[in-house]
Amino acid sequence: MYEDSVELLEPYVNRFKIREKDGRSLLNNTSSSLIERVLKSEKQVIISSQTSPKNCKYYNKQQIKWLFCIPKYPCDISELDFGNIRDFDGYSNHCPEIIAPLKASMLGSEILEVHVTLDKSKQFVDNNVSFDFKELKTLVSFIRLSEKFPT
């Protein structure tokens, strides 16, 4: 996202999503002009991060929701370590299998970001990690079923 796009989008959106690469500066307790501009909007901000944001000065800021993410297309399940997932509000999926977001949900993630495609045969950057509508429906069904487990 570009800083000038914030002004363009602001009247039409309820929240902004910051990709992992653009959010890294916050983990060093610094921020970019893009982050500052988005925070100034006072809208909810969702930020993907591979590293726990727990020690970030913005960690408890009500306006920000944090998603755990491995910034790789595709991400192999063996690369996922959900050990710190509870430091995050959710999970941004880059795995081609539905098991990763399902597990994140079962571990308490309140926000799940998945990529969706209309056509798996197309060649897009994220199409190899995108779910078609049938897979998305299966994922949602499994999540709803898992919510019936006693806690």
Give the positions of each predicted feature.
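Catalytic cores and adjacent flexible loops of soluble metabolic enzymes
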Residues: 1-151
